[in-house]
């Protein structure tokens, strides 16, 4: 496609976009079942649109938006049982995880740094390892798909700069034994990073509802940083990931001076320079509007629906759960999995076959009616 010399009327451009996006699945259809993102909350869309010109890459021009980000980090830190946290709203969990690894590396004096992480960890750590020159040391999983803490300990060496635990794995929504990892980290004087990109906006509310889940946050003294994504169960617009550090030294270790900005020179810790302030304002608006009780109701509905679905899967011939769900993610296997996946996708379902199983993520846009329709199609495909 050539760069056009003469532009088209606005109406024609919109018409072309509508035509090109016809094949896209939409959250409003209810048929996207394999995504950890969802349709943003109406308030978030309104706020994001109004403040779309704000750039936190140059915070001196937007001091009000910078203050809002500080308050967002304060509120998220409070949710995570930390009185004074230090961090940013970033592009997503990938950037947040890379920042954590970079901070651990920069504060170490190791020539050949190593990071110990579960085999269930997100692929963003592979990017972090390649970009930062950090060797990834993969820890084995237990039969229940949580990380084997004994194997983590066995792999600690003089080169270990950090340990990673997962609070809501991508494939199964499993929460590692973070308390045990925290104790281990303290015993060896090694920082622990918790990737709660998904679970961060689920676990605090699920625990309040009575679900038995391990502690995962700054209540545990070994935890030094947490990834938490408002654009997942927080219902914020993309991009809105989050990174929170226990101590300011971690942010300082990854900050570089940007001396030429219109709003004045500033120390910048994020990977991206230009950064959408609209995302930050939308997150602030949602936390203020929904509050703990509002998010708890969202999580309650998702957890109940996921438990009902898990029981329905158990009733279907030639389908079985990989494990009982911990969060609002249910994964199951079938006979002829690839064929089943193709058939379901041909019927319009946005699912993912992850490591040999189909994963259903019960996000706020997923309804009981659509899940009943999915189960009907699944039974037909398996019959």
Curated annotation (Swiss-Prot):
Residues recorded with modification N6-(pyridoxal phosphate)lysine: 232
E.C. code: 4.1.1.11, 4.1.1.15
Temperature dependence: Optimum temperature is higher than 97 degrees Celsius with glutamate as substrate.
PROSITE patterns in the record: DDC_GAD_HDC_YDC
Pfam families from the UniProt entry: Pyridoxal_deC
Single GO term (MF): pyridoxal phosphate binding
Reaction(s) the record says it catalyses: L-aspartate + H(+) = beta-alanine + CO2; L-glutamate + H(+) = 4-aminobutanoate + CO2; L-cysteate + H(+) = taurine + CO2; 3-sulfino-L-alanine + H(+) = hypotaurine + CO2
GO biological process, one term: carboxylic acid metabolic process
Needed cofactors: pyridoxal 5'-phosphate
Matches recorded under HAMAP family: MfnA_decarbox (MF_01610)
UniProt cross-references to NCBIfam families, sorted A to Z: tyr_de_CO2_Arch (TIGR03812)
Family: Belongs to the group II decarboxylase family. MfnA subfamily.
Assembly notes: Monomer.
Function: Catalyzes the decarboxylation of L-aspartate to produce beta-alanine, and the decarboxylation of L-glutamate to produce 4-aminobutanoate. Can also use cysteate and, to a lesser extent, cysteine sulfite (3-sulfino-L-alanine), but not L-tyrosine. Specific activities toward L-aspartate and cysteate are higher than toward L-glutamate.
Protein name per its UniProtKB record: L-aspartate/L-glutamate decarboxylase
Organism, scientific name: Pyrococcus horikoshii (strain ATCC 700860 / DSM 12428 / JCM 9974 / NBRC 100139 / OT-3)
Highest classification ranks of the organism: Archaea, Methanobacteriati, Methanobacteriota, Thermococci, Thermococcales
Gene coding for it: mfnA
């Amino acid at each position: 496609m050539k760069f056009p010399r003469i532009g088209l009327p606005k109406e024609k451009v919109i018409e072309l976009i509508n035509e090109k996006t016809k094949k896209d699945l939409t959250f409003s259809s209810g048929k996207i079942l394999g995504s950890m993102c969802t349709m943003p909350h109406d308030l978030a869309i309104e706020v994001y649109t109004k403040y779309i010109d704000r750039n936190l890459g140059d915070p001196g021009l937007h001091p009000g938006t910078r203050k809002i980000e500080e308050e967002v980090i304060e509120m998220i830190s409070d949710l995570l049982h930390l009185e004074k946290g230090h961090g940013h709203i970033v592009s997503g969990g990938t950037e947040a995880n890379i920042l954590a690894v970079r901070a651990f590396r920069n504060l170490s004096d190791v020539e050949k740094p190593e990071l110990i992480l579960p085999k269930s960890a997100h692929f963003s750590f592979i990017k972090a390892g390649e970009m930062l020159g950090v060797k990834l040391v993969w820890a084995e999983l237990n039969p229940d798909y949580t990380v084997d803490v004994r194997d983590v300990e066995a792999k600690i060496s003089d080169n270990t700069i950090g340990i990673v635990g997962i609070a809501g794995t991508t494939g199964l929504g499993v929460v590692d034994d973070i308390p045990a990892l925290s104790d281990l980290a303290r015993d060896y004087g090694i920082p622990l990073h918790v990737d709660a990109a998904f679970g961060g906006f689920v676990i605090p509310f699920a625990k309040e509802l009575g679900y038995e889940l391990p502690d995962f946050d700054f209540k545990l003294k070994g935890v030094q940083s947490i990834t938490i994504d408002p654009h997942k169960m927080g219902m914020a617009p993309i991009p809105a990931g989050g990174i929170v550090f226990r101590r300011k030294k971690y942010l300082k270790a990854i900050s570089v001076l940007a001396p030429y900005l219109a709003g004045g020179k500033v120390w910048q810790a994020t990977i991206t320079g230009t950064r959408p302030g609209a995302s930050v304002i939308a997150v602030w608006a949602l936390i203020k509007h929904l509050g703990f009780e509002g998010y708890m109701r969202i999580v309650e509905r998702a957890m109940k629906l996921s438990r009902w679905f898990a029981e329905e899967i158990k009733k279907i011939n030639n389908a079985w759960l990989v494990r009982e769900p911990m969060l609002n993610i249910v994964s199951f296997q079938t006979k002829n999995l690839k064929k089943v996946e193709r058939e379901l996708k041909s019927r319009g379902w946005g699912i993912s076959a992850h490591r040999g199983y189909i994963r259903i993520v019960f996000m706020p846009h997923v309804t009981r009616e659509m899940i009943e329709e999915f189960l009907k199609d699944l039974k037909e495909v398996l019959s």
